[in-house]
Amino acid sequence: METTHRVFVEDSRDLSTLEDDSVELVVTSPPYPMIEMWDDLFTRLDPAVEDALEAGDDRGAFEAMHAQLELVWDELERVLVPGGIACINVGDATRSVDGSFRVYPNHARVLEAFESRGFDPLPDVLWRKPTNSAAKFMGSGTLPPNAYVTLEHEYVLVFRNGGESRDFEPGADRRYEAAYFWEERNRWFSDVWTDVRGELQDLTEDATDDLRDRSGAYPFEIPYRLICMYSAYGDTVLDPFWGTGTTTRAAICAARNSVGYELEEAFLEAFDDGIGEIAALSRSVGRARLERHRSFVERRREAGDVPGYDAEHYDTPVVTKMERSLRLREVSSIEGESGRYRVEHEPLSVSSD
């Protein structure tokens, strides 16, 4: 199996390099409005943002920032296939402007924007990303009533483009081989994820401190899960806010195609420096999934409840008929650089089979 991966150093408010209905899934984490680390970016996109902040017009700044994101949402409506899924990882912001502290509900604003463009909202996910700082509590400490709840979660908002789900040809191998294990379904499709911790995506050792400071990447597990949940082999995943390339890395490990857009070429250079590690990552991710499944089966067996079906490609039982054709892939080779990559995948090699 071969997949292709492209990264454009371009502004994602204009995705004219992509044709209509050319991607099946969007997985992205945009810059969060009213988070201070993104003020400079939003100001470059629209100087009115800085003017509003300097004037203490927090609501005006909030709306101006979201107006820039909405130009991207307009493009997503065009390039995403009917029935395709968009997964938007976004967090709310807390901030004091002109001496007044409040929360800025980014998730609600994004939800409104997508629904107004004809997307159907689907059940979303909260993922908890606890911080361990001793000073994480805001306000008056232990004195009521002026202390504030600390935000330790982000949202994965899920939307379908239009009212109908995607169609597949009956018995499509690319869909059945992309199945997930029954116990993965139960964990992944829970509305609260407590087993994924927030962290900065590791960059290469020679990346500059400035590049690290500007990295707001979500953990690899977030896009990897979403890609497995909402796409099949042969699909293309788009990330219009590419950053350090976590979505592309996850798409490669999941054996899907991908497209990314990024304003800063330095992130692409850092991705090229670490591309040699992706083959080993894909192998370890696949083997970990299979080993977790085998441990799950063993626990079921000890409880006297052995799953009733056999996997076709692995020496293990599975719970449902739909899992029988499941086939994991690993990377055998990667060619290319500077935003154009061709990846060869082969069935996961597991010595214990």
Regions found by a protein language model. Name each.
Residues 128-203:
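Flexible, glycine-/basic-rich loop-and-beta segments that form/coincide
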Residues 1-138, 184-353:
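S-adenosyl-L-methionine-dependent nucleic acid methyltransferase catalytic domains
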